[in-house]
Amino acid sequence: MTDEPQFPAQQQQPPGLTGEMTPEPDHGEESYVGHGRLEGQVALVTGGDSGIGRAVAIAFAREGADVAFTYLPEEKPDADATAELVAGAGRTPLALELDLTDRAACDEAVGRTVAELGRLDVLVNNAAYQMARDDSFVDFTDERIDRTLKTNLYALLWTTRAAVPHLRERPGCVINNTSIQAYEPSTSLLDYAATKAAINNITVNLAAELGPDGIRVNAVAPGPIWTPLQPATQKAEKVANLGGDTPLGRAGQPAECAPAFVFLASPTDASYVSGTVLGVTGGMPVF
């Protein structure tokens, strides 16, 4: 643990952009080397334009998968960069501009992935919304609650529901992105933390229900990771000290999360792994 600033104090307007971060995150652009663990597969990564989603898209592509990913209109510069990185790995990118708080958009994400890339092997439910708050709980707005729940929970359920019939054909797998907030919730992120705890429960339940179909369902719980979500949703001083309270004394990079997703997606490496949450937290416990 350390009290030393980790990053320059900074803020952005949500949802945040990679190019406006100082320093820019490491998504594995220069470091990730694939070994063919997902050769010939197709993955759909929600919120895959930046942060952990981009790192996962890069890693999956370098492991041999074509990658579809969703993004919001404001995130197009990041989405274009991610698509180029997937294509640079010799795989086919499919960038889908969709707001997953709409059920029809979740259905479209899955439908277009299968229609344009031919199949679906891996679903990564990564898209999320958080916003640190200063106000009292009694001032919590319905709009804030609705956006957090729809982005983090409804979209996950809708997208997974649409994906299951296609995943049964392979069979494939689902990987949910949860958070250390499910275990050590921050008061300022009450709604976000609650959705992440719910995702843990959903992961276990879906693993039990879909296991007989051969579909594995797991989750990754990142700790404080240097992504656009941080300067776009936290106070500048909080951003500066991101990760300083972890046992490793620093924030993680998206590139340090991606191998966990690759492991869980691999039909050989994780063939008997289902219903678990894998922590990538810098030493913070996830039990």
Where in this protein do the model-derived segments appear?
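C-terminal helical subdomain
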Residues: M1-H27, A219, N241-D269, V273, ...
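The beta1-alpha1 cofactor-binding region of Rossmann-like NAD(H)/NADP(H)-dependent oxidoreductases
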Residues: K76, E97-V110, D142, A255-E256
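Substrate-binding pocket helix/loop in short-chain dehydrogenase/reductase
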Residues: D134-F137, T141-D146, L242
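Active-site loop-to-helix junction immediately N-terminal to the catalytic Tyr of the SDR YXXXK motif
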Residues: D135-S136, P185-A193, N205
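Active-site helix of classical SDR
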Residues: T160, T195
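Alpha-helical segment proximal to the catalytic Tyr-Lys
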Residues: P165, A208-P212
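Residue(s) in the substrate-gating loop at a strand-loop-helix junction
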Residues: S179
